[in-house]
UniProtKB/Swiss-Prot annotation:
Belongs to the 'GDSL' lipolytic enzyme family. Its EC number is 3.1.1.-. One of its GO terms (cellular component) is apoplast. This is GDSL esterase/lipase At1g29670. GO terms for biological process: lipid catabolic process. The lineage of its organism: Eukaryota, Viridiplantae, Streptophyta, Embryophyta, Tracheophyta. It is found in: Secreted. The keyword Transit peptide does not apply.
Length: 363
C-alpha cells in the first residue's frame, strides 16, 4: 500500500511540474526573445572578458540583489520587456546559457560593442554586432538539434522577437574619440551614418537568413545629454548638440531602413523604437515621470558625477528613483522601466514605428 501511494505521489508531482511549465510558457506572448546590443542591455557577457567595460562589482546591481554585469542599479530595458512579454524570468546571457534554456531566448549584448568592428577597442575585449550574430548562428544550430530538424526550428524562431540596439558606442567610443580613431577625419556625420546603416543592414539580413522575422530596432538615445557629455558642457545642463545631431542623423536613417527592410522582406516585420524621443521626454519633463535629477549620475566622480563612471565600492545616491542616470552613461532602473514600457506599449505616435512591441508580438 505504501509503495502504491508513493508511486501516485510521484505521478502527481510530475503532473504538477508539467502543468507549471506549460503555464509559464503559455503566459509568454512569444516563445523566445533574443537580444543584441551594448552596455545598455548587457547582462553579463563581458564578465569573463579582459575589458574595462565591465560592471560585475558593487554598487552595480544594488537594487537587483547584487552585481550581475548589468550597467545599472537594477533592471535593464530588455529585462522589463521580457516581463511585459510574459516570460517567467530574465533572458540569460550567452556566456552562461545552456541546454534547453536557449529555447526561451539568449542575450548576446556586449558592453563597448559597436556596429563597426574597431569600435570600443581602447576598452579591451568586446563582442561586436557581427560577433553577436555569429554567436546567434551557433545558437540556431543548437535549436535545430533540440527541436529535431530545420523546419521545426524555422517555425519556432520566426515567432520570436529580436531586439537590436547598437550605435551609441560607434559615436562615443569611435567617432567622437579622435585620439584613438580616425573615423571623424574620414567621414562627415552624414557619411558616417550611411556607413553604419550599411553595416547594420548586412547583419540584420544575416539574422533574417537564420530565421529571425520579428525585429525591434532601437535608435540611439540622447547621448549628448548624458552626465559624461554634460560634464564638458559650459553650464553642465545644456546637452551637447554636435553629439545629439549626429545621433539623430543615424536614427533618421535607421527609421528609413525599417521601411526598406519591410519592403524587401514581406514575410518579416521590422519596427523602430524611438529611444531618443522617449529619453528627451524624460529629460524635458522630469516631474511627470517622478525624476528630480536629469543632469548627473547617481554614481560617479567629477562634474555632473559623469567624468569618471561608478567605481567599485563607491556609495551611490540614496534616492535612485529620482535620477534618470545611474552612472556617467547608463539609465537607472526607473528610467529603463519607462523606456521599456513605452517601447512595448507606445504612449505617443512617435514612440514606435510602424507599431510597438506588443503589436509585434501578436503577429
Amino acid at each position: 500500500m505504501e509503495s502504491y501511494l508513493t508511486k501516485w505521489c510521484v505521478v502527481l508531482v510530475l503532473l504538477c511540474f508539467g502543468f507549471s511549465v506549460v503555464k509559464a510558457q503559455a503566459q509568454a506572448q512569444v516563445p523566445c526573445f533574443f537580444v543584441f546590443g551594448d552596455s545598455l542591455v548587457d547582462n553579463g557577457n563581458n564578465n569573463g572578458l579582459i575589458s574595462i567595460a565591465r560592471s560585475n562589482y558593487f554598487p552595480y546591481g544594488i537594487d537587483f540583489g547584487g552585481p550581475t554585469g548589468r550597467f545599472s542599479n537594477g533592471k535593464t530595458t530588455v529585462d522589463v520587456i521580457a516581463e511585459l512579454l510574459g516570460f517567467n524570468g530574465y533572458i540569460p546571457a550567452y556566456n552562461t546559457v545552456s541546454g534547453r534554456q536557449i529555447l526561451s531566448g539568449v542575450n548576446y549584448a556586449s558592453a563597448a560593442a559597436g556596429i563597426r568592428e574597431e569600435t570600443g577597442r581602447q576598452l579591451g575585449q568586446r563582442i561586436s554586432f557581427s560577433g553577436q550574430v555569429r554567436n546567434y548562428q551557433t545558437t540556431v544550430s543548437q535549436v535545430v538539434q533540440l527541436l529535431g530538424d530545420e523546419t521545426r526550428a524555422a517555425d519556432y524562431l520566426k515567432r520570436c522577437i529580436y531586439s537590436v540596439g547598437l550605435g551609441s558606442n560607434d559615436y562615443l567610443n569611435n567617432y567622437f574619440m579622435p585620439t584613438f580613431y580616425s573615423s571623424s577625419r574620414q567621414f562627415t556625420p552624414e557619411q558616417y551614418a550611411n556607413d553604419l546603416i550599411s553595416r547594420y543592414s548586412t547583419q540584420l539580413n544575416a539574422l533574417y537568413n537564420y530565421g529571425a522575422r520579428k525585429f525591434a530596432l532601437s535608435g540611439i538615445g540622447a547621448v549628448g545629454c548624458s552626465p559624461n557629455a554634460l560634464a564638458g558642457s559650459p553650464d553642465g545642463r545644456t546637452c551637447v548638440d554636435r553629439i545629439n545631431s549626429a545621433n539623430q542623423i543615424f536614427n533618421n536613417k535607421l527609421r528609413s531602413l525599417v521601411d526598406q527592410l519591410n519592403n524587401n522582406h514581406p514575410d518579416a516585420k521590422f519596427i523602430y523604437i524611438n529611444a531618443y524621443g522617449i529619453f528627451q521626454d524624460m529629460i524635458t519633463n522630469p516631474a511627470r515621470f517622478g525624476f528630480r535629477v536629469t543632469n548627473a549620475g547617481c554614481c560617479g566622480i567629477g562634474r555632473n558625477a559623469g567624468q569618471i563612471t561608478c567605481l567599485p565600492g563607491q556609495r551611490p545616491c540614496r534616492d535612485r528613483n529620482a535620477y534618470v542616470f545611474w552612472d556617467a552613461f547608463h539609465p537607472t532602473e526607473a528610467a529603463n522601466v519607462i523606456i521599456a514600457r513605452r517601447s512595448y506599449n507606445a504612449q505617443s505616435a512617435s514612440d514606435a514605428y510602424p507599431m510597438d512591441i506588443s503589436r509585434l508580438a501578436q503577429l
